[in-house]
Amino acid sequence: MLPFQIESWTVPLPPVHNDPTRLESLNDIRLCEFDFLEELPAPFEPVENQSHPGRGPPILKDSFENIYDLSGERPIAEPLFRYFAYPPAGFTGSSSVVPSESQESAHFVPMEDRWRIGVPIWDRYGRDHPRLDDYPQAPGNIFNPYTQNLLKEDFPLIGQNTFFNLNVASRTIANFRQVPTPTTPFESTPTPGEEDFFGNPNGFFFLQYYTLAFELNHGDKTFKPNDWRIKVAPVINTNYLEVYELGVVSPDVAAGTRRSRGFATLEEWFLEAKLADLSPDYDFMSVRAGSQPFTSDFRGFIFSDLNRAVRLFGTRLSNRDQFNLILFDQREKDTNSFLNSFDPRGQTIFIANYFRQDFIWPGHTVQASFHFDNDQASLKYDKNGNLVRPDPVGLATPHEVNAAYFGLATDGHINELNITSAMYYVTGHDTLNPQALQPVNISAYSGALELSYSPDWIRYRASAFYASGDNNINDNIATGFDAIIDNPQFAGGEFSFWQRQSIKLLGTNLKNFNSLLPDLRASNKFQSQANFLNPGIRLFNLGMDFELTQRTRLISNCNFLYFDTTAVLQSFVFQDNIPTSIGTDLSLGVESRPLLNNNWIFRAGISGLLPGDGFQALYGPITGQVPNLFAAFTDLELAF
């Protein structure tokens, strides 16, 4: 019997076996006609989605049939909800989440590992998950980085918030070049009878890098920054150089014209920890200690390197502002692979910068920065036997360089006009400049501006770069601008002949590879000291970028190059009236991403320098002129 009396009312029972007549008859029954209620079985029968077979999850029937009590409520003793366990998309690995509770009712099923909740197998378009398409719910395996993968931070390795990332990368660079190459007439020459100071300009340089990076981090994988990160990345390099003049691979002419080297190191390693949350909008402050990459401005005009440092960084005002404070204790670089060793460099660099997004115009970012370079006095020969500190010119005595850079840079767009700019002023002191033969005070400046417009698939670019030169080598003020370790992505970047090639002049380099500055530094910029007695440069660029397809881009550039002043060069080579014209740099490059991502990148370029009067005066033969110089390269990056 019922425990209490109720008024007669219609019981809203669910349909049984989708029979409408059954539903009508049940709705007409009055509760007062029953003295008791018999409990009925509660079967669970999954049925297919009849309206869309094979698409979407199955439609489940109600697991209860006519088992309401007379108050219209479910019974207390319900059968547990049963369901199909579908595998998650991608490669998930084994879950490390140990269940802490079991199912106790049909209303709630514990799913403690929220990352591995499966979905029905679904071939959305009936095309068997093509490899190059963005296809949902694709099955994965451990060797496929394009679907969700435990090794690519898509699923936690430990618990709910600790992830592992494995990166395996290969980079292969082949570089053919023609640059002025001095002969060795007093020792020996590979070609008897050579009379000119500069001989065969041809050379081939090959670099192969293998990187294996392991990263463990703790976080939520959305907008929230990581709580902590640990990363280590060993790198192996092999390199090969072939030239046609002696004294290039080594000062010892007996070393020949070919050189093959290898080097292995722990290139990147650091520990990162979040110190504080600065706002409810995921603003944070973190610290990172160890060997880490860092570029100090938008285009790498002053500093771009990977070395040992302690960095304090974070965001403010809903990520509208960003800041960095970083102190580098530089390690020595391997001469031929440019990788870090574990030997101290004797150079300390401090950098502070602050970014403000949407400055004046939406999409326009401004940056203020400060750099300080303390390069201590030392005597250093590189692994090929070349003197790199101090410069092997003039008074080659160890000296200390202290330089402070003050900079302001912008990057972004103003309406449809893309704009990048930078201005820097450097001041400091060199205790004994080898060329000036005396201590000098540093006072130099530089500026850069790039404007571009992209109405469609073509981007039109115009840019200019200026670095002041020194017009009096005999005073005690050095006004030639030099960077710390630059790698500018500007005016053609790595596709440009002038920027990509290293051009020697007597015992130094007129300019270093991956640099715009003719700074007369020794050997390479990683091991030598900054030199502020240099001719400076004026560069004007016109370029066009063509987005041929979603996968392929064509980059073309034309650079007009001039020394700012040639007074330093005239004293350096004991030659009067050197013109300022360096020449015209023409380049054409292609960049392809066949898989529409960074797992496979191919770059190739061809470039040439049409020498101007100033270049002819420095490198011209006894009779005739310097021929046009050409270079070509290929660069293949593969990553997992």
Regions found by a protein language model. Name each.
Residues 85, 92-93, 97-99, 106, ...:
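Outer-membrane beta-barrel channel domains
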